[in-house]
Amino acid sequence: MGRLLSCLIALSLVACDTRAEWLERVADGIMGTRIAVELWAEDKNSGNDAIEAVLAEMRRVDAVMSTYKPASELSVVNARAADTPVTITPELFDLLATALDYSRVTHGAFDITYASVGYMYDYRRHVRPTNEQIQDALPGIDYRHVLLDRNARTVRYARPGVKIDLGGIAKGHAVDRGIAILQGRGIKHCLVTAGGDSRIVGDRFGQPWIVGIRHPDRKDEVIARIPLEDDAISTSGDYERYFDENGKRYHHILDPRTGQSASKVRSATVIGPTATRTDGLSKTAFVLGAERAIELYEKLGDIDAVLVKPDGTVLYTKGLQPPAGARQH
């Protein structure tokens, strides 16, 4: 009854307020991915202004946290933190603290110091480090090498050779920042997406948003459709940034223990309260394996997930109802 009433109210609003508009915008090239914003606005001008504000915020976050921009705050940290404590902005400090918390919760499966080896990969040019190069750089991977001083608001590295990359969490953070901007403008129905990371507020025309999870090998095939309202969702897959060589796939999600591409799942979709959280936790299944990851997500309590194993088996957390015929954890 409550859902029916909500739908009738939404339809009534559509019929009565001819000024209200549903707006959509897609922008490429921000944070190295595609950004999409959808929202229900009181009028077209205010809606477009809100979208522009979100895109500007995405560019700002990228300018701070990109490792591809030598002048970014994160690049400065990587250049100096092995030698001296580096004072950083509250935003970067808090995100680093969050990332380290995820590392502790996942027992190191999520680790931003993967970049100590990861920087040697170039997936566009099909470049990978040799085993010798990996072994030489591997001691730099350990989240405990990243030392934060909250009172001084500094970060330093415990040893030379440490590099960090926030690629596993920064897009989710940018999505959350975009949503905060929209909510600050009074927008109650919207979606912000950066690559595989999305956050949803409210509904879409009185109905839940329907999010499809693609098959790892067949991009036009959907393995599950999930109705969402007021949730974040992140999907990570070994089909995003990769190259194949001699029958082996090298992709961007690395196992911190080996410096090699993690291969225990093909795809991980995580649903939770914020995109920062789902972005970070979606990577961990590749390292932990599907069964251990499901156990972790259910223990956390605010996370649901759909995982695709290498053999095609699909596992779900208990909070999700799997499609008929699917194999469930």
Cite the ranges covered by each PLM segment:
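Mature catalytic core of soluble alpha/beta enzymes
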Residues: 2-6, 16-329
